[in-house]
């Protein structure tokens, strides 16, 4: 999916959250994450980790981000064990080969995948 297609999918998927007066803004990022975070008045960056292999890269990125802006903290959230193997690349590949990915993506995302691959 293009960046704009991904933004539209996410916006559609979080509609119910925004109805609860949450303050979620989905936007394209260009440039440095620390600059974007500062421009948004953010004080932390939340990153997800699936496996130990993700940690090394994220740890290095956190170190660089700290050097660029020490006022912004990074928080890591671990996925549940049952979802630790899921990645967008695996989902796209399984879907292209005709596999059922409905347990891994939203209904809206599945519809968009079906349209894209038909």
Name each model-derived stretch.
Residues 1-118:
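Nucleotidyltransferase catalytic core that binds NTPs
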């Amino acid at each position: 999916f293009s960046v704009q297609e991904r933004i539209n999918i996410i916006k559609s998927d979080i509609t119910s959250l925004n109805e609860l007066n949450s303050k979620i803004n989905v936007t394209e990022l260009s440039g440095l994450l620390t600059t974007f975070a500062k421009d948004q008045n953010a004080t932390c960056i939340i990153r997800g980790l699936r496996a130990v292999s993700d940690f090394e890269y994220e740890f290095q990125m956190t170190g660089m981000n700290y050097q660029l802006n020490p006022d912004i903290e990074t928080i890591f959230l671990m996925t549940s064990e049952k979802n630790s193997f899921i990645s967008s690349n695996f989902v796209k590949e399984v879907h292209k080969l005709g596999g059922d990915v409905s347990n891994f993506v939203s209904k809206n995302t599945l519809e968009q995948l079906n349209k894209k691959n038909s």
